[in-house]
């Protein structure tokens, strides 16, 4: 392609809307154009990148035995109501675009396709002889993000590959899951990206286990915790670890103490001269279930730890049936306005004890009259701990848990009934010890999630009646997995991982073009002729090449070549007199003079080395 004929416009300044380097560079380099909030046009250079990423994805999926198809983007609400996810996606997470057609039928624009594919499997898969199956598509998805930002990282429409496997049993699912895991590793390696596969929370998709694939980048939205031995890595939302050991408490006598102005752990520990590991703090949450029921949750956790709200929400979803719901729509620390709707009296915030009386909850419609009491594992084994006294300005010291779990009254003075709900809701953090080897400590890195694979099990097949007849003649649910990778997100993540002050540094495998021939001076006939011949020969040899034949100064052309990130820049300049051209490698900035007849074999060698197969 000749740049003089391409719709090619670059910007010298960073657009005001862009926050992270990759977003700025894709806009400046003319790869994308903003059309609306979270909505972008893919311009010709970007479309070539997306085509290359899609082709690598397609090749690896096909190699793993998956079959390509295309599913409808408009989905009937009834399918999502069958699976129980309509309210979750239109109310709780609220990420589905919902619409009503002229017959007043509710529809959704597909953010994902579990319901559609399960319906197809229900209709077409009858017997174990048809298993296993794995279907995938590469398609535009839609999600109504609350705050679209970062360009293609969090947009309202994006290109995604989603695959769905159907197996006879859990063992076969694990085989399919393993194949997809390897396919994703192959995709990322072939795209030239540094990444980690990490344990992850399954969220609204559900299932028994999942992994995210994180492209490592300083601006990544996600925090990854990992061990240097390579045996553990997890998203911080899912990560588990061993906290530091609690220090033994010297406050062995139970008593109530006046502790004015100590409504934070730091202030309390300074006042009492104790370690935060000797404190049980009690954090109040407000959960709203999908049936409108509001539940107040009191979480007791060791004073040096923080609550992981993703883990907490998962625990509360498990309890949903107790309150007549299916899922949690909202989980918050209630502010003064929220408290005013249910609190019968002023709460002793900062001084709450594990036994805060249920009478603090006023008799109110749709408010559960009792606190849900949970205790994190970090607090269970504490002895002689410090905690609130349910009175502002006071704490108790030397407290213990009663031996009888779930006891409704204190066994004796100074003891608190241990809640029935003993859970792991603490946030793992860097420096914690690893479970698999306490000598290993967790390190931290930032990552961009570009892929997520799930072992769904029978969540959808049971809900939607997708069954098959097994070898024993029994009708049993299909066992499912689902596997997503963001094609457009991966492309921007590659930029976020690899750029410099001058522009993008594309991995060779997914660069829009592999080489660009630059004519410094259009008035020099020898430069124009040599460049044109090279351009034709390179393309004929299978090396995708641009020709910068614009009537611009050489400096402008060089800056644009750096900005758009083409891996190899070939300049027909002064060295032509010696039968050579200058070849600059974008990644290393190294410059080499190469004889004209050696340009093609040299570039072929470099490209082969840079593109793992």
UniProtKB/Swiss-Prot annotation:
It catalyses: tRNA(Pro) + L-proline + ATP = L-prolyl-tRNA(Pro) + AMP + diphosphate. It is an enzyme of class 6 (ligase). GO terms for cellular component: cytosol. Gene3D superfamilies: Anticodon-binding domain, Bira Bifunctional Protein, Domain 2. It is found in: Cytoplasm. Keywords: Aminoacyl-tRNA synthetase, ATP-binding, Cytoplasm, Ligase, Nucleotide-binding, Protein biosynthesis. Its EC number is 6.1.1.15. GO terms for molecular function: aminoacyl-tRNA deacylase activity; ATP binding; proline-tRNA ligase activity. Its main location: cytoplasm. GO terms for biological process: prolyl-tRNA aminoacylation. Belongs to the class-II aminoacyl-tRNA synthetase family. ProS type 1 subfamily. Consists of three domains: the N-terminal catalytic domain, the editing domain and the C-terminal anticodon-binding domain. Catalyzes the attachment of proline to tRNA(Pro) in a two-step reaction: proline is first activated by ATP to form Pro-AMP and then transferred to the acceptor end of tRNA(Pro). As ProRS can inadvertently accommodate and process non-cognate amino acids such as alanine and cysteine, to avoid such errors it has two additional distinct editing activities against alanine. One activity is designated as 'pretransfer' editing and involves the tRNA(Pro)-independent hydrolysis of activated Ala-AMP. Homodimer. This is Proline--tRNA ligase.
């Amino acid at each position: 392609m000749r740049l003089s004929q391409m719709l090619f416009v670059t910007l010298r300044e960073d657009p005001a809307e862009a926050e992270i380097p990759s977003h700025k560079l894709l806009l400046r380099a003319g790869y994308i154009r903003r059309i609306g909030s979270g909505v972008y046009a893919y311009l010709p250079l970007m479309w070539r990148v997306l085509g290359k990423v899609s082709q690598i994805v397609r090749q690896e999926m096909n190699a793993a035995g998956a079959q390509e198809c295309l599913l409808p983007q408009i989905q009937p609400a009834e399918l999502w109501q069958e699976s129980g996810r309509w309210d979750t996606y239109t109310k709780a997470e609220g990420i589905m675009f919902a619409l009503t057609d002229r017959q007043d039928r509710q529809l959704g624009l597909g953010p994902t396709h579990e319901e559609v594919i399960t319906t197809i499997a229900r209709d077409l898969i009858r017997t174990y002889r048809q298993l296993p199956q794995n279907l995938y598509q590469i398609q535009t998805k839609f999600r109504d993000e609350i705050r679209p930002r970062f360009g293609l990282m969090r947009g309202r429409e994006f290109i995604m590959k989603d695959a769905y496997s159907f197996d006879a049993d859990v063992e076969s699912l694990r085989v399919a899951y393993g194949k997809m895991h390897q396919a994703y590793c192959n995709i990322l390696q072939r795209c030239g990206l540094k990444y980690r596969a990490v344990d992850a929370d399954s969220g609204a998709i559900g299932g028994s286990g999942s992994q995210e694939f994180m492209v490592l980048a300083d601006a990544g939205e996600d925090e990854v915790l990992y061990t240097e031995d390579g045996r553990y890595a997890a998203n911080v939302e899912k990560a588990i670890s061993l906290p530091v050991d609690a220090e033994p408490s010297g406050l062995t006598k139970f008593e109530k103490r006046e502790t004015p102005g100590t409504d934070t752990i730091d202030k309390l520990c300074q006042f009492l001269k104790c370690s935060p590991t000797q404190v049980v703090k009690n954090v109040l949450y407000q959960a709203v279930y999908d049936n409108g029921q509001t539940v107040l949750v009191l979480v007791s956790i060791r004073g040096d730890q923080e609550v992981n709200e993703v883990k907490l929400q998962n625990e509360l979803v498990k309890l949903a049936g107790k309150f007549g719901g299916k899922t949690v729509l909202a989980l918050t620390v209630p502010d003064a306005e929220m408290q005013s709707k249910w609190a019968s009296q002023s709460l002793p915030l900062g001084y709450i004890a594990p036994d805060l009386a249920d009478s603090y909850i006023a008799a109110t419609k749709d408010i559960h009259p009792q606190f849900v009491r949970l205790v994190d594992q970090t607090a269970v084994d504490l002895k002689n701990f410090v905690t609130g006294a349910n009175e502002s300005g006071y704490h108790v010291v030397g407290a213990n848990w009663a031996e009888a779990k779930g006891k409704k009254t204190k066994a004796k003075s100074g003891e608190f009934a241990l809640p029935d709900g003993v859970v792991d809701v603490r946030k793992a953090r860097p420096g914690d010890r690893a479970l698999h080897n306490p000598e290993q400590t967790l390190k931290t890195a930032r990552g961009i999630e570009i892929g997520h694979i799930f072992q769904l099990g029978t969540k959808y097949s049971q809900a939607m009646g997708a069954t098959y007849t097994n070898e024993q003649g029994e009708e049993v649910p299909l066992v499912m997995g689902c596997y997503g990778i963001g094609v457009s997100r991966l492309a921007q993540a590659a930029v976020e991982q690899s750029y410099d002050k001058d522009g993008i540094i594309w991995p060779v495998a997914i660069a829009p073009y592999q080489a660009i021939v630059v004519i410094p001076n259009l008035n020099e006939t020898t430069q124009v002729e040599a460049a044109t011949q090279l351009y034709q020969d390179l393309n004929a040899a299978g090396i995708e090449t641009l020709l910068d034949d614009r009537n611009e100064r050489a400096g402008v052309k060089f800056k644009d070549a750096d900005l758009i990130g083409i891996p190899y820049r070939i300049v027909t300049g002064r060295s032509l007199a010696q039968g050579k051209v200058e070849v600059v490698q974008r990644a290393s900035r190294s410059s080499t003079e190469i004889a004209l007849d050696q340009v093609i074999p040299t570039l072929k060698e470099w490209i082969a080395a840079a593109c793992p197969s």
